[in-house]
């Protein structure tokens, strides 16, 4: 069974991200190859992984509507002093 990929894109970042993440950074999670393309700090990864896993496996996740009309999930990094927002979407 072929699974989907999930793309995480930084859509907002304020202050100083200690990991150096910037708006536009992308990470692809591929369940077929078990590979991750790109980089994501451990703090953002551990907090976003349940939502990423649910998206990849057809789980129920709260969605927002992106500018292109597609459904996306949003996730906030746990660093409250330097907020970073990820947009999570399924890619083929």
Residue spans for each PLM region:
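Short, Lys/Arg- and Gly-enriched loop/turn segments at beta-strand edges
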Residues: 34-44
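Short alpha-helix capping/helix-loop boundary micro-motifs
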Residues: 11-16
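Short, compact, well-ordered microdomains
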Residues: 4, 61-92
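Short, basic/aromatic beta-hairpin or loop at an interaction surface
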Residues: 1-8
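Short peripheral tails and domain-boundary helices/loops at the edges of structured domains
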Residues: 46-67
């Amino acid at each position: 069974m072929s699974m989907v990929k999930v793309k995480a894109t930084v859509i907002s970042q304020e202050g100083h991200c200690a990991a150096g993440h910037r708006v536009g950074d992308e990470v692809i999670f591929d369940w077929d190859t078990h590979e991750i393309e790109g980089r994501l700090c451990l703090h953002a990864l551990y907090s976003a992984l349940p939502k990423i896993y649910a998206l990849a496996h057809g789980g129920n996740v709260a969605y927002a509507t992106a500018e292109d009309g597609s459904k996306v999930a949003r996730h906030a990094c746990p660093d409250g002093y330097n907020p970073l927002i990820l947009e999570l979407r399924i890619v083929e």
